[in-house]
Design a protein with these regions (language model features):
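A Rossmann-like FAD-binding core segment of flavoenzymes
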Residues: 1-75, 118-122
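Short, proline-enriched alpha-helix->beta-strand connector loops that line the catalytic pocket
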Residues: 28-29, 84-86
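A conserved FAD-binding loop/helix module that cradles the flavin
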Residues: 74-85, 91-123
């Protein structure tokens, strides 16, 4: 996107194809800007499994052919937002398969806290 046009509200955006240089005008009533879509997961230990794009795998994304992730030490499946390391949970844009945005991240965070308490209650 190279330009937002309108008077008292957004009416149109100009989009540029970075490969061809072509610019097109698209009618619009709103613009959602997603900045920094690269997940910041480099600080995590290597045992936390990530996708090729760096998104953290959790829950069912870790299951392969109905089996728990390799090295999973517990006698239960991973919780929905639990990573390949028991007790480490991922929420928001860093999680593989998430719907990017504040509302989704907030919901993930709330659910992760609940799952963390569930994890702690097992001790």
């Amino acid at each position: 996107m190279i330009e937002i046009k309108g008077d008292d509200r957004i009416r149109e955006v100009s989009l540029k194809n970075n490969k061809t240089g072509d610019v097109s005008q698209v009618p619009a009533a709103a613009v959602f800007v997603f900045i920094g879509q690269k997940p910041q997961s480099d600080f995590l230990p290597p045992e936390v499994i990530r996708s090729l794009s760096g998104h953290v795998l959790t829950g069912l994304d870790l299951m392969r052919e109905g089996k728990r992730p390799q090295g999973w030490p517990l006698d239960r499946d991973t919780l929905l937002l639990e990573t390949s390391v028991p007790g480490i949970f991922a929420a928001g844009d860093v999680r593989n398969g998430t719907k990017h945005g504040v509302a989704a991240a907030s919901g993930d965070g709330n659910a992760a806290v609940s799952m963390f308490w569930q994890y702690l209650s097992s001790f």
